[in-house]
Amino acid sequence: GQLDKVTSACNRLAEMDVRASLFIDPDRLQLDAAVAAGAPVVELHTGAYADMEGEAQLVELQRVVDAAHYGHELGLIINAGHGLHYHNVAAIAQIPEIVELNIGHSIISRAVFDGLAMAVSEMKRLITEARSG
């Protein structure tokens, strides 16, 4: 695969004091590869979770939970994102190993109607409530 190329890129970035972050599926093999490549940070792809409903979404949520826990045990900084919005962010925000959520599209879409300050404030409230409860 691409491990040699990714490792080389991670090394070049590290030489410039830049932390590489790899966007990966919530999968143990990809987490192992991220460690092998020398990436200190990963962003777990939450798109499949965001696209699903019902039981299938719960199964995918568990994949994200398990991946976040495993990646944290490996020493990685765990972020998550893609497809997260006001109605599905809470379950992901509750995962304690996740340091940062990358949410953009839904906030900007909401901002068209409610203004950016209101859109950001509401998303922040949802994340804060999920993390404190």
Locations of regions flagged by a protein language model:
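Catalytic cores of alpha/beta
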Residues: 27-37, 80, 84-98
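C-terminal helical cap(s) of enzyme catalytic domains, especially alpha/beta-barrels
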Residues: 57, 110-132
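Glycine- and other small-residue-rich loops at beta-strand/loop junctions that grip anionic moieties
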Residues: 23, 60, 81-82, 112
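Surface-exposed amphipathic alpha-helices with a cationic face
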Residues: 7-17, 35, 65-73, 124-131
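Glycine-rich phosphate-binding active-site loops on the catalytic face of alpha/beta enzymes
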Residues: 42-53, 97-116
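Histidine/lysine/aspartate-rich catalytic loop segments that bind and position anionic ligands
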Residues: 18-74
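Charged helix-capping and loop-helix junction motifs
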Residues: 1-5, 56-65, 117-121
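C-terminal active-site rim and adjoining tail of enzyme catalytic domains
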Residues: 77-86, 102-105, 127
